[in-house]
């Protein structure tokens, strides 16, 4: 296979069982570490098993507001002194909420690791959620949602989720709606924190200029005795089938000069054997080069899109396969038809051997680039743990990609992508 020299050159330096240390603390926290002494910095990333999946329907955005409030104050620091501590050593620290997890990310020098870990521990174990800061962030959230309501791309994506995930928790936006944010009180965030934050299922990755034993001992000292016996766990994620016929939803946003659209369907979860064939197929359909076949047809040859590409997203539970475009409002129906035609062709015959070879080379060639920084490695370690992929994932990944055939892509694609059963979401003037 051509263009795999970058992977072959760096294969021996990719993270694996020989240089990843995995350790479980007594309270349920999993620690993953990898040393890299080429620079004096550390990347510290982690997640807790709490997110918007636990939000009540009438208080969507609660997990988002709770995560946003973790750095507003702790039992030891107020908002300003906490940020001063971080900035005084040139470090960074932030928290954010997703559907299934609440994440944190920090970057610092090796000698400042204990300071940053202590601050992470404070924010997770003793946040105070001051009323004035809660009100400020609530207002900021309402402003962000007002901006979202005028964003054609964001609203098309929201509409798309409501079609393919109808009746499913994934149809709900993590940020909620203005009417749900309005109902949330400081007391709600305090209670959500007490109910759902804890060490069970928590994962921390430390990558950089540190020995594994030192990192593990530091985490034992800062988070090893944290417990929440009443920690609420995430519910089982329900399954969902494909929509039975093409369904279109449109949202009018007056005054806009561009329309955004999303066409697509549900996709398998991350651990499905269908994931890799679809990943390579998606690259051919709307990613590789100038955004694959979609980019060539809709943008290059027809000139009808400002941008067009496809995206395959998979996690736990049902995923999504989206074809996304920004177009002149007068071209919406034409572009939807073109995308549908490309989908129909894509499921009618195998991809070419050249397309398959190029796509495989792309995935193998980019892997070392994704893992060249401490941050990239830390993110990857979290993914290995989150999806139970195994510490040897990067050593076995090439075989998985190289084994994919054009016929396998065709048969797998047909299981999900049906040109007569598409979700079509449009937002524009």
Which residues does each predicted region cover?
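Non-catalytic beta-strand/loop surface segments
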Residues: 1-57, 72-114, 135, 144-200, ...
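Active-site SXXK
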Residues: 61-72
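A common structural junction motif
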Residues: 122-129, 221-230, 341-350
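Carbohydrate-associated surface elements
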Residues: 209
